[in-house]
From Swiss-Prot:
Main localization of the protein described in the UniProt heading: cytoplasm
HAMAP family recorded: Rel_fac_1
Residue numbers carrying N5-methylglutamine: 233
Keyword Membrane: no
Keyword set, alphabetical order: Cytoplasm, Methylation, Protein biosynthesis
GO cellular component terms, A-Z: cytoplasm
Organism of origin: Acetivibrio thermocellus (strain ATCC 27405 / DSM 1237 / JCM 9322 / NBRC 103400 / NCIMB 10682 / NRRL B-4536 / VPI 7372)
Gene that encodes it: prfA
Protein name as it appears in the record: Peptide chain release factor 1
Keyword Protein biosynthesis: yes
Amino acid sequence: MFEKFQAAENRYDEINHRLSDPAVIANQDEYKKLMKEHAELEVLVTKYNEYKKLTKEIADAKEMLNEKLDKEFREMVETELKEAQEKLEVLKKEMKILLLPKDPNDERNVIVEIRGGAGGDEAALFAGDLFRMYTRYAERNGWKTEILDSNPTEIGGFKEVVFSIEGNGAYSRLKFESGVHRVQRVPVTEANGRVHTSTVTVAVLPEAEEIDVEINPNDLRIDTYRASGAGGQHINKTDSAIRITHLPTGLVVCCQDQRSQHKNKEKAMKVLRSKLYEMAREQQHNEIAQERKSQVGTGDRSERIRTYNFPQGRVTDHRIGLTLYKIDDILDGDIDEIIDALITTDQASKLANGAEDDED
């Protein structure tokens, strides 16, 4: 492990030297590439320097304990040594996590699809609540959101909404949101105050670039139609909405939220690329495909990754057994505590798998 950190430090020093080279500075593409690598290595180098500093403190303390010391001073050194050794164990775990293989999609933008499952109007209302939760979370992180397609209902909410989130590390933070989200509350339409259960499915896709997916124009059927709003009424007098069908796979994507047909086509192609990219990833990694299917499922009430219980003010993530009693804050975009816990569990699982591989 430490050889990898030493190699990272050597490369970091080399990049520092190259970044002062006028020829590199003049080549913007090369300069940006090196700056990105520099930033990634800096995290490793900082942690490695902490490790070297701590191991030196431990060695110095042990050497001091070999000398003749008065009782009070010896106890102080022994306490400091114990604390440093405990810090070192924590630091080693953090260093192992830093060496875990990175998900190549972590830094990508995302496309999020939210669809009402079981529960009719109430599911559509909760789809709207989740849309607001994710857009508020994006705002907190300084990320940009844009609706690509939506099917609003007359009483508020969405039958479905597709939107993009652009920002550094968006996929790394939101990829665990894919799945069935269950809500338990008294619907606004319920006269006698009974609690109903509804579900909403969420799918988070890493946004694909044009270079990631090659699409043959002959494989596409493109239809235009008039954009409609809640209840089906037409909101545009021209056929600006776009429906693209990818004939080889049968995938269909729509976009009607832009006034321009050209912009709607551009946004629809973005969604199609990301869906095809995800399909290719699933074929390459069958275990990921199985995991994703079990997460997203059918929208049936029995399948869930998270429950939002309004009467109790409770949100429970069933994958990790985490329960928080701050439903209003969470639906206002305060979801970092859940996301951090999911990432920590994922890292622990990868570390455990790595340890098993080492034993093999």
